[in-house]
Regions:
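Membrane-proximal basic amphipathic "stem/tether" segments
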Residues: 1-49
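C-terminal substrate-binding/active-site "lid" region of AdoMet-derived donor-dependent transferases
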Residues: 166-245
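Short SAM/SAH-binding signature in class I
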Residues: 154-164
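Glycine-rich phosphate-binding "P-loop"
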Residues: 37-57, 74, 165-170
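S-adenosyl-L-methionine
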Residues: 116-156
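SAM cofactor-binding core of SAM-dependent methyltransferases
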Residues: 56-133
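Conserved acidic residues
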Residues: 75, 159, 190
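A conditional alpha-helix N-cap/helix-loop micro-motif detector
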Residues: 57-59, 141-144, 170-174
Length: 245
């Protein structure tokens, strides 16, 4: 009887997991279609090659990033982690005069060299290399992995912050985003996009971001967008429509 019950429970678990996977895969395909149809509207966009998914952001992430760039037109963007999203933001910096500054934080000299061999960044894009400290496992609020020694002026006047680095931590993942939130004022115009928000570490980070915003009496909107991976947007009251894309 116990073996039969165990097999029944395992079958039920497999069915739920399989169904969830299929639902996420279907949602991912829809996001791919939505992004493709909304993005390929000019020659430079049609010529931009992006590898979406796996270590890079998913289709929902790229659609949300594209919409924020189009709708908000940020003059300054700070990006945590060098990758496919850097191509998209830098291409906007090359082709749109409203994007004046794009700062990318990255820790790996090898990856920076490999990326720059394959892609020419805009003159308005700048990579700043910062070492990492902390750890990804058995960590907490004080010792999760993050970039070291980020100057406070990096965050000043940034309207958009994209968080897709460094590597995720089990707890309080990608905590450098707190430094950006702490320097905001109640009337600051801002958008923060956090990738991989389906993971526990990123969920803990989002909880702390909410706590910080509330403590600073900052009104904000928040929305998670799904697919094979999830990303979450947190924005000031100036951009309420970003929570219903």
């Amino acid at each position: 009887v116990k073996n039969l019950l165990r097999r029944v429970l395992q079958s039920a678990y497999n069915a739920v997991s399989h169904g969830s996977y299929n639902e996420r895969l279907l949602e991912e395909n829809v996001w791919h279609h939505v992004f493709r149809e909304s993005f390929r509207t000019t020659q430079w966009k049609s010529e931009l090659a992006l590898s979406i998914g796996r270590w890079a952001g998913g289709a929902s992430f790229f659609y949300i990033l594209h919409r924020v760039l189009e709708d908000v037109k940020p003059e300054k963007v700070v990006e945590l982690g060098l990758g496919e999203s850097s191509k998209l933001i830098s291409s906007y910096a090359s082709n749109e005069d409203w994007l004046k500054s794009h700062i990318i934080l990255e820790h790996s000299k090898t990856w920076i060299a490999a990326f720059c061999d394959r892609f020419q960044l805009s003159e308005n894009s700048e990579i700043r290399r910062h070492d990492l400290f902390g750890k990804t496992q058995n960590c907490g609020f004080t010792d999760s992995l993050r970039y070291r020694d980020i100057e406070i002026d990096i965050w000043q006047h940034a309207t958009l912050v994209v968080v897709d680095g460094p590597f995720g931590s089990e707890s309080y993942s990608r905590m450098n985003s707190f430094d950006f939130i702490r320097q905001l004022l109640p009337e600051s115009r801002f958008v923060l996009i956090l990738d991989d928000s389906h993971r526990v570490g990123e969920k803990e980070t989002l909880t702390e971001i909410r706590n910080l915003l509330s403590a600073q009496k900052i009104t904000y909107h928040e929305k998670e967008y799904g697919g094979m991976k999830s990303c979450t947007i947190v924005c000031s009251h100036h951009f309420p429509w970003l929570a219903s894309l």
